[in-house]
Amino acid sequence: MQEKGKCPVTGMTKHKTSGGTTNQDWWPNQLNLKMLHQNPTMRNPMGERFNYAEEFKKLDFEALKNDLYALMTDSQEWWPADYGHYGPLFIRMAWHSAGTYRMGDGRGGAGTGNQRFAPLNSWPDNVNLDKARRLLWPIKQKYGKKISWADLMILAGNCALESMGFKTFGFAGGREDIWEPEEDIYWGQENEWLGDKRYSGDRELENPLAAVQMGLIYVNPEGPNGQPSALASGKDIRDTFARMAMNDEETVALVAGGHTFGKCHGAGSATHVGPEPEAANIEEQGLGWKNSMGSGKGIHTISSGIEGAWTPTPIKWDNSYLDTLFNYDWDLVKSPAGAWQWVPTDPTAADSVPDAHDPSKRHAPMMTTADLALRMDPIYGPIAKGFRENPEAFADAFGRAWFKLTHRDMGPRTRFLGPEVPTEELIWQDPVPAVDFELIDEDDITGLKGKIIDSGLSLSELVSTAWASASSFRGSDKRGGANGARIRLAPQKDWEVNQPEQLQTVLQALEKIQDTFNSAQSGKKRISLADLIVLAGCAGVEQAAKNAGFDVCVPFTPGRTDASQEQTEVESFSVLEPMADGFRNYSKGKYTISAEKLLVDRTQLLGLTAPEMTVLVGGMRVLNANYNKSQQGVLTKRPENLTNDFFVNLLDMDTAWKVTAEGGDMFEGIDRKTGELKWTGTGVDLVFGSNSELRAIAEVYASDDAKQKFVEDFVTAWNKVMNADRFDLA
């Protein structure tokens, strides 16, 4: 007889794919190395050879836009369009796709199509956006691999604006879809929707978060924690939008521009609304929030709980939002769903807004508490009034802010695809000059390497400077990196981690080599300082390998240029300053998060794997490239020799490790037999012997037959970091 609960084919216990106690349950503080291996090719149905950029170039862009325009007014019975136009719904979808971006760590945003997956597809703030994506499905189905979901959602928002009379600033494609939820994005510590444990002290929001509550994109529209105070809401809005890289003018333009269109939905109590998509029954086929009130759609729709439109013309671009905001005084009321909102005190406004589905009905406009902040806040108010008096300035500001919102996480313009990419260079895109000179060749590279090695700079100085320049890159929003040589500019030149005094010495020596080389050229051949910094690091690695007995050539590809201070927004770049860099054994202060976890986080931002992280840390230690030449973790008697000594000595069982007398994250390696001090290290060093997964990798590099493999793997990982921002090489 078949044993109960067993699979009749394999005998596997049922529910093996879910439930059960996981390693993370047993050991909650365990390092999450999965975040270093997200979206592997085996999860991607497009295959390893798929090139999205090439497929996008084959797209009939105008035909796609025409199909999107047609969809805007093709109301479907299963989810009828408000006012006969889906435009406002698609604007909200695009906005909420892009609006998860936060500049603190560059994560979130529209660049991956992650709104399709948990948790975002089930956030309270994204109620009924599942319907927007289903409305888009026939178009996605038609164009297939030529347009990603990530690009399509943003383009749909643009087409929505255009179909309602707004001229957009532009559109760029190039967002490639992911195929599973991200492991690396910290959305908050709360374990219930709309929780706000992220605040401490005097309403200080936890970094790097930007949204005020779990499951919201920005702020609570009813006011902080649902309390209807416009002034308090203004403070929340300013903090949140600033963390999403928007200044006050951009914030007012975005809110006023976005709320020019559509309406909010709160026809009845939230008790009518069923579970979100991830919790819905299988027969719902990925749709959530099934509504038991009336028809469950149209006039009975329940989304935010707020009910009504902002303007008399909800599907037309005009100044009516600002006119409505300033023309009336406002009374606080509750919506049919019980949410706080505001309506005009003037009774003549009661029939100024059309009904979204019944032409025989009229309504008063409404405003949320967050809307009133644009009028009541002492900074936002004058900006909003100025936009009201100058509609052209308002339209320009909204167009630019919308483009920034929807493209902020895409990185430099070299990644932008399509016929509608704006020609204007925008400061937030971190521009670098175009290459207007002849690049150096192999003979030049060889000669320059010799000059660098003979310059008097130590190998550790060459390596640490190149690392400082290139490792500023973060793959989340494609910012930073060696291109531009911004390490010589504010703010990077003054970052503590970059050792400003040593940095200036190295830069002066390299600039002298650069000037000598460029002055000797009769033609247009030049080397940029950005290239020379990287080349110097490569020369240092090569020499260190040679010192260890290995003859290797570290790859180098010229083509970087030098940005100016005018092309560098200091405040914007300040968020790239590392609070910790385990590769250099650096920490700016003491944090509640362990140094090991910060190392993994930085590794993920650099786009590195666990083996690459391991080999780089081991190599940087023996190259003596620590911050301030600290000897923590320099587990070698042969510094500046590219050996596997770090791993050999870390895993040596003749050494016992203990916390130093000072405690904290400092450790001493003691000879078990003599009791003598052999080494010192940090948690970042010891984790490669402590963590079982990292130890498994470290054992590979500590093996007797791995000396050459270590060098080769270090060079490969080094080259990856040096070229992390070279999208022109892709």
From Swiss-Prot:
Its required cofactor(s), as named, are: heme b
The record ties this protein, via Pfam families, to: peroxidase
For the cross-link Tryptophyl-tyrosyl-methioninium (Trp-Tyr) (with M-244), list the residue numbers.
W95-Y218
Q: Which reaction does it catalyse?
A: H2O2 + AH2 = A + 2 H2O; 2 H2O2 = O2 + 2 H2O
Q: What class of enzyme is it?
A: oxidoreductase
- Briefly state the modifications made to the protein after translation: Formation of the three residue Trp-Tyr-Met cross-link is important for the catalase, but not the peroxidase activity of the enzyme.
Cross-link (Tryptophyl-tyrosyl-methioninium (Tyr-Met) (with W-95)), chain numbering: Y218-M244
Spell out the GO cellular component terms annotated for this protein, sorted alphabetically and separated by semicolons: cytosol
UniProt site (Transition state stabilizer): R92
Q: Which GO terms describe its molecular function?
A: catalase activity; heme binding; metal ion binding
The record's family statement is: Belongs to the peroxidase family. Peroxidase/catalase subfamily.
Q: How does it assemble?
A: Homodimer or homotetramer.
HAMAP family (alphabetical): Catal_peroxid
Q: Which PANTHER family match?
A: CATALASE-PEROXIDASE (PTHR30555:SF0), HYDROPEROXIDASE I, BIFUNCTIONAL CATALASE-PEROXIDASE (PTHR30555)
What is the official name of this protein in its record?
A: Catalase-peroxidase 1
